[in-house]
Design a protein with these regions (language model features):
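A short glycine-threonine-serine/GTX helix/turn-capping micro-motif
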Residues: 34-35, 177-181, 234-242
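Peri-catalytic and regulatory segments of divalent metal-dependent proteins
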Residues: 22-152, 190-206, 214-229, 237, ...
Length: 308
């Protein structure tokens, strides 16, 4: 038991020494991370494979090309231009986007319909890129790893006590639960900087959050009437309402460059994009439901509501 305890303490000291040598790519200040950039990239690549296994990628070459080129342009102007950046649109009506370590950024189709201009899309791309450049997921995982190790040290002194958690599970928790208010605020500031570097209107991110708040309020009203679960919104930002207003106010307090918006070009690009569930997942015509993939159809009785 004592030998195991000593080995864990020794491992904790090694982790601490590694963390003290790391510098944050954005701030240049010492960073508490226990994961190297190579490990970060490998983790992102592995997670990307799992996402592709469990998600459907949008089949729209023109829109995907536009989105990827915009993402790559912003990424090349970021604090980590040399990462092998990868931008993916998931064919899902969810209002969300997320980023994983190593340069992987994902947007859901459902989110694209809520942008009013290319500048707003660039703002959210910049925000997700900022989470990667500032190593937010890596920092969160590093803190959790050391915390788990400390708990493990305590568990070692208790007969039968044990604890285990993989980096993959930690990353999954961060992606699903979202980031802390501190990290979201930091990503907002960095995103505003990236918008300026690329000549976009720096109020775009704040304008998008206002739109999403309105959309989320409507979704929640509908959910209440139907007795459905309340939406957490983009990045879970609406799970605690006041923080959203604070983020918008913080972005509006700092000086902004009134750069380009490219509204017309963006709206033309998303024209015809399915809203909500796509026809491939089933659709209604009058009182009949059709599902192309399963090659089935059936009638819905009057007065019934269909949930696909």
């Amino acid at each position: 038991m004592l030998k195991i305890l000593k080995s864990k303490i020794y491992f904790l000291l090694i982790l601490t020494s590694i963390a003290s040598c790391a510098k944050n790519p954005v701030s240049g200040m010492p960073d508490f991370v226990t994961i190297t950039e190579q490990q970060e990239v490998e983790m992102g690549r592995a997670y990307h494979k799992e996402i592709l296994k469990n998600s459907k990628v949008l089949n729209n070459k023109e829109l995907t090309k536009y989105y990827v080129e915009l993402g790559e342009k912003i990424a090349k102007s970021s604090h980590r231009p040399d990462l092998n950046w990868k931008f993916t649109i998931i064919d899902d009506p969810t209002f969300n986007a997320f980023a994983t370590p190593g340069g992987y950024v994902y947007f859901y189709r459902g989110l694209l319909a809520h942008f009013n201009s290319e500048a707003e899309l660039a703002g959210v791309l910049s925000h997700e890129i900022a989470h990667i450049t500032a190593r937010h997921a890596v920092r969160g995982m590093s803190t959790a790893q050391v915390t788990n190790l400390l708990i493990g040290l305590a568990a070692s002194s208790v007969p039968g006590g044990s604890i285990s958690n993989s980096g993959f599970n930690l990353l999954n928790q961060i992606v699903n639960k979202g980031y802390s208010r501190k990290y979201e605020s930091e990503a907002d500031d960095i995103a505003k900087e990236y918008l300026g570097r690329n000549g976009y209107n720096q109020n775009a991110m704040a304008n998008f959050l206002k739109t999403m708040k309105s959309a989320d309020d409507l979704e929640n009203e509908i959910a209440k009437k139907e007795g459905s679960p309340i939406s957490a919104g983009y990045h879970n930002i609406f799970s605690t309402h006041p923080s959203t207003e604070n983020r918008i106010e913080a972005m509006n307090r700092t000086e902004s460059i009134a750069g380009k918006k490219n509204k017309d070009a963006f709206l033309k690009m998303i024209d015809g994009l399915p809203y909500g569930t796509s026809d491939e997942e089933g659709y209604m015509r009058y009182n009949t439901f059709y599902h192309p993939f399963f090659a089935i159809k059936f009638s819905i009785p009057k007065g019934w509501d269909l949930k696909n």
